[in-house]
């Protein structure tokens, strides 16, 4: 998709704040600082539209980015950040669960993991949770440029094994630095939009 028009429509914490246009929605989930904002910026051809931060836990709302008046990217708060209080994590968890399990416009979830490391327990839990609810998932392994290309298959295999990856999901290595994987991610998104 050629992207020219993007707007942060709303940062929501409750269903009554969600957009009402009925556009397909693609949620981006992953632990704090895994690269959700960097992926979003790469997909929409912007350097810093979605705010990136070296401070984990920056996103605390569901951020609905309207793309070309055709779909929404929904940036979800990162999980697994220890400096956020347990109460705050529980609040985010309920907000995310309500969105994922009840939003009919949600057509798929891009679950980001760090390509350099095996998935965390939180990554595994999120992936299994999405599969349990039969939500289409694209696992995107970010920061792939930090790994020698000859080791990508090895890292992909470790990630898939840890997630107990199944054939109904898709997988893509990705780098915001080199834009590698951008077209494949867009293809997956466009396929979901047609469903």
Swiss-Prot record:
GO terms for biological process: division septum assembly. It comes from the Bacteria. Its cofactor is Mg(2+). Residues 22-195 form the EngB-type G domain. SUPFAM superfamilies: P-loop containing nucleoside triphosphate hydrolases. InterPro entries: G_ENGB_dom, GTP-bd, GTP-bd_ribosome_bio_YsxC, P-loop_NTPase, Small_GTP-bd. GO terms for molecular function: GTP binding; metal ion binding. GO terms for cellular component: cytosol. Keywords: Cell cycle, Cell division, GTP-binding, Magnesium, Metal-binding, Nucleotide-binding, Septation. GTP binds at residues 30-37, 57-61, 75-78, 142-145, 173-176. PROSITE patterns: G_ENGB (PS51706). Mg(2+) binds at residues 37, 59. NCBIfam families: GTPase_YsxC, small_GTP. Necessary for normal cell division and for the maintenance of normal septation. Belongs to the TRAFAC class TrmE-Era-EngA-EngB-Septin-like GTPase superfamily. EngB GTPase family. PANTHER family: ENGB-TYPE G DOMAIN-CONTAINING PROTEIN, MSS1/TRME-RELATED GTP-BINDING PROTEIN. This is Probable GTP-binding protein EngB. It comes from Pediococcus pentosaceus (strain ATCC 25745 / CCUG 21536 / LMG 10740 / 183-1w). The lineage of its organism: Bacteria, Bacillati, Bacillota, Bacilli, Lactobacillales.
């Amino acid at each position: 998709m050629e992207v020219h028009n993007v707007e942060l429509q709303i940062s929501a914490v409750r269903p009554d704040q969600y957009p009402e246009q009925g556009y397909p929605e693609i949620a981006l989930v992953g632990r704090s600082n895994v690269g959700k904002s960097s992926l979003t910026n790469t997909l929409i051809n912007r350097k810093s539209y979605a705010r990136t931060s070296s401070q984990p836990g920056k996103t605390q709302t569901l951020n609905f980015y309207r793309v070309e008046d055709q779909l929404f990217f929904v940036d979800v708060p990162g999980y697994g950040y220890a400096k956020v209080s347990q109460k705050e994590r529980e609040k985010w968890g309920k907000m995310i669960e309500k969105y994922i399990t009840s939003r009919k416009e949600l057509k798929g979830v891009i679950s980001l993991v760090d390509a350099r490391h095996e998935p965390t327990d939180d990554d595994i839990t999120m992936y299994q949770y999405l599969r349990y609810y039969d939500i289409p998932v694209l696992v995107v392994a970010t920061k792939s440029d930090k790994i020698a290309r000859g080791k990508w298959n090895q890292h992909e295999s470790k990630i898939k094994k840890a997630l107990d990856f199944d054939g109904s999901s898709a997988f893509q290595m990705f780098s915001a630095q080199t834009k590698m994987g951008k077209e494949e991610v867009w293809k997956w998104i466009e396929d979901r939009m047609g469903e």
